[in-house]
Amino acid sequence: MRNKICKELNNTDIGKLVNLCGWVDRRRDHGGVIFIDLRDHSGFLQITINPDDGAALFKQAETLRNETVIMVSGIINERPKDSINTNLSTGELELKVKDLQILNQIKKNLPFPVSIHDYENTKEELRLKYRYLDLRRGKLLENLKTRHKIIKVAREFLDNFGFTEVETPLLTKSTPEGARDFLVPARLSNGEFFALPQSPQLFKQLLMVGGLDKYYQIAKCFRDEDLRADRQPEFTQLDIEMSFISEEEIISFNESLIKKIWKEVLNIKFNNAFPRMSWQEAMDNYGTDRPDTRYQMLLKDLGGILGDIGFNIFTKAIKSGGYIKSITVKGGNSSISNVRIKPGGDIFQVAKDAGAGGLAFIRVKGDELETIGAIKNNLSEEHIADILKITEAKDGDLILLGAGDKLIVNQSLDRVRQYIAKDLNLIDKSKWNFLWVTDFPMFERNEEENRYEALHHPFCSPKNIKSKDSENLKKEIESSTANAYDLVLNGLELGGGSLRIHEANLQREVLKMVGLTDKEIDEKFGFLIEALEMGAPPHGGIAFGLDRITMLIIGTDSIRETIAFPKNQQAKCLLTNAPSNVSESQLKELDIEITIDE
């Protein structure tokens, strides 16, 4: 049907007969000549139709509406100099039409304009409902092509290092991995269910047990969890696993992979190794294990200074084993008013939404500290000097303080730090601040259920374990950090991984420590334990979030802009209206009865 696409045309095509297919982007009638901007997936070309070319052809062109699908044949001409469009690669050319065929006439009014000339901000819900029209606008198509290039670069890199791409099952066993599983009823096994995988974790480990040595997969994963801008119920991982490998080797290799992607896709080269930071250092200084290091405002511990000044909130925080921490906003006295950090203010609300009761604040004015009387009246000159030294605050700076439970103080000051950095334009958006976070704890304590929870997952190998007997082994695991590592970019986790447990007794002990009985271990993970008893090699790996990598590379705030047909924030597909009801006969075949709470 066509022998060229728009972007292929250049001055060497002048005088040639070409066939093009595409959409009418817009039509203009000027002085008896019809000008049409033809759009295909690659770009635009102006086509012209003159009454002298034939009355029937001209009349047909007059009927064309935007988004009509056409095929045109004609001669490529050079545009008159006064009509050259320097914004287009084909802006010096036009097609003088000899023949026009309407392949599909537009029959419905469009829900929103597609043409770049009529572009308007359209509500995302409408864009998701008519995703095929949104794709035609071009930006989304470019995003998908960028995503394709990222995958292509990764595949070539891994192939060159001897990796084998293997597909793992999408219908698998429900195992506790943190989020809820999507369950699939098994018709041939009454009352039993498959689960869609949250990750290929166990299968890729079993591939290592099977001797594959180096594996990767562009893996679809599923988690039934509450959504936000950078989450989807189904998402894609670049999943990697290797045998006979150290933590250092995994980090070094995957850093090279990420550098390769950035070089090939963005032409950005990183000469130095990515910096590293322990989990504890990240939590102490940033309040999060995903720190954005493009700006300052580090958290500072003031518990040793303010814990005994007699201010009840501070005293209570320290006595209960909590924190008093601060962040310093440079020039904050002039940029942030009291209204914003008191109840009802936007900054106060950010802290409250993160679990804090509120924020205390100190304004530095010369050598004086201005704050509420209950704090100020109990500060000695030594207190003031120590506060200024630790916070590095100067005249005109604002010190914000959080006090209470360690987790809540870290979480609330982290959120406030991020919010203020955006609000005051403190973030250099040209920076790519990669960071490896290492030495994660093996567990975090679930006080409500009085048990441990794995911080990454219960298949991470603890560091420096020597004991073989169960009691000493448990003590060593409790005090150990994990052979785990995350790659963070500008405050977002790009990927995470670990060395895996490859000894059956150690794996069983870790699973028991997260609350599983021996019976539950055998029921849920018996196949893994058995495999580890049959000569499993030391192995480890990492999984990168492909959607998030693409999101950062194309410079958007939502991974929905990187996916052809995403779900909305209620996990619904507005295009197909999924999920949807199914017929009674389908449910009957599965022996499923639905009851809905009133």
Curated annotation (Swiss-Prot):
Subunit structure: Homodimer.
Site, as annotated: Important for tRNA non-discrimination: H30
SUPFAM superfamilies, A to Z: Class II aaRS and biotin synthetases, GAD domain-like, Nucleic acid-binding proteins
Protein's gene: aspS
NCBIfam families for the chain: aspS_bact, PRK00476.1
GO biological process: aspartyl-tRNA aminoacylation
Any one GO cellular component localisation term in the record: cytoplasm
Keywords: Aminoacyl-tRNA synthetase, ATP-binding, Cytoplasm, Ligase, Nucleotide-binding, Protein biosynthesis
Record function comment: Aspartyl-tRNA synthetase with relaxed tRNA specificity since it is able to aspartylate not only its cognate tRNA(Asp) but also tRNA(Asn). Reaction proceeds in two steps: L-aspartate is first activated by ATP to form Asp-AMP and then transferred to the acceptor end of tRNA(Asp/Asn).
Subcellular location: Cytoplasm
EC number(s) given by UniProt: 6.1.1.23
Chief site of localization: cytoplasm
Name this protein carries in UniProt: Aspartate--tRNA(Asp/Asn) ligase
